Regions:
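Cytosolic/matrix-facing juxtamembrane and C-terminal tails of multi-pass cellular membrane proteins
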Residues: 138-162
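Loop-to-transmembrane boundary segments
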Residues: 79-101
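Generic structural hydrophobic/aromatic packing signal, biased to beta-strands
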Residues: 20-21, 87, 143
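Alpha-helical transmembrane segments of integral membrane proteins
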Residues: 2, 6-14, 85, 89, ...
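Hydrophobic transmembrane alpha-helices
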Residues: 100-145
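Membrane-proximal soluble regions of multi-pass membrane proteins
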Residues: 28-87, 153-162
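Long, highly hydrophobic alpha-helical transmembrane signal-anchor segments
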Residues: 1-42, 97-115
Length: 162
């Protein structure tokens, strides 16, 4: 395994491998009935999200080929409560996929550092992992907060009508 990882690690393998590991890891978490523990976390607030450039990165994702990877995360049509709740659930699943992928991949990077890969490789792989996994976690959390605001506004309007 050591030889395979140290000789075959490249950025494309990193990104798509971590996505795959994230999907499997999240599936295992769902099967273990511990998924509820991962549903409503906010690791950073809106101000830091903006300062880190996560929203600009989100624009880049939406306007590049990467935006094609998860069509379930696009809201189309008229705004209604059920669609927003489903979109939030899909975003939570995607967020957890990226979080699990980030943790597993960063663990592999640290393991490879102990195995003797160059420091520039550790730094490069870590930056790639942060951008393509952790930033996507932050982006999903930001979007979920926006959905929560819309849902609470709709609920308040419904209470006023009643």
């Amino acid at each position: 395994m050591k030889e395979f990882l140290t000789n075959n690690f490249n950025p494309i393998f990193l990104v798509f491998g971590s996505y795959t590991l994230g999907i499997f890891g999240t599936g295992i978490i769902k099967l273990s009935r511990q998924y509820h523990r991962f549903e409503n976390h906010n690791y950073i607030g809106d101000k830091l999200t903006k300062k880190l450039g996560v929203l600009k990165f989100g624009w880049l994702i939406r306007h590049s080929f990467m935006g094609l990877f998860n069509p379930k995360l696009k809201f189309k049509g008229k705004l209604n409560h059920e669609k927003l709740v489903q979109l939030k659930e899909d975003m939570t699943f995607a967020e957890n996929n990226h979080l699990v992928g980030f943790v597993i991949l960063q663990s592999l990077i640290i393991l490879m550092a102990f195995w003797g890969i160059e420091i520039w490789e550790v730094v490069t792989y870590t930056i790639i992992n942060i951008v393509f996994n952790l930033y996507l976690v932050f982006l999903q959390q930001y979007n979920k907060r926006r959905i929560d605001k819309i849902l609470s506004l709709n609920l308040a309007r419904q209470k006023q009508k009643a």
